[in-house]
Design a protein with these regions (language model features):
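ABC transporter nucleotide-binding domain
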Residues: 175-260
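Conserved ABC transporter NBD signature motif
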Residues: 58-74
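Helix-to-loop junction immediately C-terminal to a conserved catalytic motif
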Residues: 50
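Catalytic Walker B motif of ABC-type/P-loop ATPase nucleotide-binding domains
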Residues: 155-159
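C-terminal coupling/interaction segments
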Residues: 263-299
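Conserved ABC ATPase "signature" region
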Residues: 97, 101, 109-126
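Conserved ABC ATPase signature
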Residues: 130-134
Length: 299
């Protein structure tokens, strides 16, 4: 059964199309990563599903409630990027108490759940720290804790791994997987972190210019890649003529008397190594924009 149903969704900003999504559905326990370049409409999409922003046309139903109704906030919680929206000069604990009060709850009612979240996200050292002194990643944790205390059926996350270190990402991934698998929570997540998306997603949606242009499992869209890297190789610019003869189709740049070329194919990298003296070399992770460009243009 599809618990999120979107039909003929449209949103414009100043006459420009921000969203144009004819159809989208999601079901309990699904983790959907929404990826795309900046300005693709990712954040706008989850804000509309959560009821924080309203569409110009179309319908959004979440567990039977329209996103325009007050009931939507009982089912959906949105965690914004960088943990914004808290009282800077209250502690983390004081902010938690305040938001519990807004939701007509109290610490005594959620004592066990709160302790469990503190443990899973290693949050105990920060409970009495002012929010103004928390790092971006720790604010993200606070945002997630407050959202989950409301026991949402749908959790919308906007770039949730920004500011998180490797250990925090693993804690975060484990928690989201537990929510989806044991409680059936739907997680809709915008992200530029392709490796995090690979680890936890049941489905990937690629957005471009306000449209969902491709969706499927991670392997269906990105193949079996485990890393996306390119090689930056430098040789002496005195070897320019020889390089152009051997590799006429490769472009390059000249920097500080070095000829710099970028390649992604390891065999091509080895061919360059075998034919020239290498004076500079590094592996560089590709950006999400570069990865998506390759995926979209391979279709």
């Amino acid at each position: 059964m599809n618990e999120i149903i979107v039909r003929n969704l449209k949103k414009n900003f100043r006459g420009k199309v921000a969203l144009d999504i004819p159809s989208f559905e999601s079901y309990s326990g699904e983790i959907v990563s929404i990826v795309g370049t900046n300005g693709a409409g990712k954040s706008t999409f989850i804000k509309i599903i959560s009821g924080l922003m309203l569409q110009d046309a179309g319908d959004v139903f979440v567990f039977g409630s329209k996103n325009t109704s007050k009931d939507i906030h009982n089912n959906v919680k949105l965690v914004l990027e960088s943990g914004r929206g808290y009282y800077e000069y209250l502690t983390a604990n004081q902010n938690i108490d305040y938001f519990l009060h807004l939701n007509k709850s109290s610490r005594s009612q959620v004592k066990d759940e709160l302790e469990d979240l503190f443990n899973k996200l290693a949050f105990h050292p920060y409970v009495d720290v002012l929010v103004s002194e928390l790092s971006q990643g720790t604010r993200q944790k606070l945002s997630l804790i407050i959202a989950l205390l409301c026991k949402p059926k749908v959790l919308c996350l906007d770039e949730p791994t920004n500011g998180l270190d490797v250990i925090a990402k693993k804690q975060f991934a484990k928690l989201l997987l537990t929510l989806s698998q044991e409680k059936g929570t739907i997680v809709l997540m915008t992200t530029h972190d392709i490796y995090f998306a690979k680890e936890i997603s049941t489905r990937i949606c690629i957005m471009s210019r306000g449209k969902i242009i491709q969706q499927g499992s991670f392997s269906e869209i990105f193949g079996k890649n485990t890393r996306w890297i390119k090689y930056r190789i430098g040789i002496s610019d005195s070897e320019k003529d020889a390089f152009e003869r051997l590799f006429p189709d490769l472009s390059y740049q000249v920097e500080n008397e070095r000829l710099i070329v970028e390649v992604k194919d390891s065999q091509l990298k080895n061919n360059i190594f075998n034919n020239f003296e290498i004076i500079f070399f590094e592996e560089v992770e590709e950006s999400i924009e570069e990865i998506l460009y390759e995926v979209i243009n391979d279709d």
